[in-house]
């Protein structure tokens, strides 16, 4: 009786395992785009209290402007590129005390673990700020060959 396929040998299994293990860091290294991934999170969870409307703005903090993110404040710098644990934004969204955590616990919309990890990864990758797509100058694409 013929076997339709040969069982995986130890070396084939080892090669497959190594391939999977080596591909995981490559997936984690995917750059996080501020405009596509971070700004929508902020818009959904933060801009209500820290956005354009000065009458509703809390803490004198406006998160829709780049200047606010990178200049030192009395409490600390909102984002220290490459250092989430030194970034006030990250320490506030991961704070263990519910009274100090952002968004406040009474807000219906809370950050998900995936959103928190995206913010962490964005900071780790250098916190590259990209303007809203509507402010990016149009470029003519290259002609096809």
Describe the role of every protein-language-model region:
Residues 1-12, 92:
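Low-complexity proline/serine/threonine-rich segments in eukaryotic and viral proteins
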Residues 7-25:
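Bacterial N-terminal signal peptides
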Residues 25-145:
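Aromatic- and Gly/Pro-enriched helix-to-coil junctions and flexible linker segments
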């Amino acid at each position: 009786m013929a076997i339709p396929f040969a069982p995986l040998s130890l070396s084939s299994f080892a090669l497959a395992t190594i391939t999977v293990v080596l591909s995981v860091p490559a997936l984690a290294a995917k750059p996080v785009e501020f405009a596509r991934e971070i700004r929508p999170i902020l818009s959904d969870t933060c801009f209500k209290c820290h956005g354009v409307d000065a009458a509703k703005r809390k803490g004198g903090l406006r998160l829709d402007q780049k200047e606010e993110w990178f200049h030192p404040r009395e409490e600390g710098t909102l984002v220290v590129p490459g250092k989430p644990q030194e970034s006030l934004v990250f320490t506030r969204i991961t704070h263990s005390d519910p009274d100090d955590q952002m968004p406040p616990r009474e807000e219906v919309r809370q950050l998900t673990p995936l959103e928190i990890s995206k913010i962490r990864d964005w900071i780790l990758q250098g916190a590259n700020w990209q303007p809203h797509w509507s402010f990016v100058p149009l470029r003519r694409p290259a002609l096809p060959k």
